[in-house]
């Protein structure tokens, strides 16, 4: 699955087995921390039983990231795929979600959230398990009417991962250099009409 995520269908990512396992634990609704006590026979049976859904959600999430214009060159946090895959799983989203007109607004909301979370420093670093658990809890109870951006951002802010930018952060973004890791994300916000699935 890792090689398929990273290089199939034109994708170029560098997802690891750890990201796949973290996603599997998230989707099966078990404790997602990498602790020996979490890898019980019961939990691993849940992962095995849910593997087709886990695999499908991860592959669709990787395709979405590719459609958003991301690759290993500019995806600054591989962990962002975890909540995307979980959300797609909860929705029961099939391949049609990736390009259906009916889901275009939802994909755009998801893309904007992903982009802001990648532009803002410190979101996907320390405290990752707490962040992913909070996002999972919000998605589990708020995913029926599309990606719940406001609820997710509120939960993120509650654990010190606000997506609000202050003036100093905005000034820093204005000074990003060509080919910097976050430059693509900032430009994708400034030029929303571009087809970002094309490689620039």
Per-segment meaning from a language model:
Residues 29, 40-43, 71, 99, ...:
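Serine/threonine-rich low-complexity intrinsically disordered regions
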Residues 1-5, 103, 200:
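Short intrinsically disordered, low-complexity coil segments enriched in acidic
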Residues 118-200:
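Intrinsically disordered, low-complexity N-proximal targeting/linker segments that flank membranes
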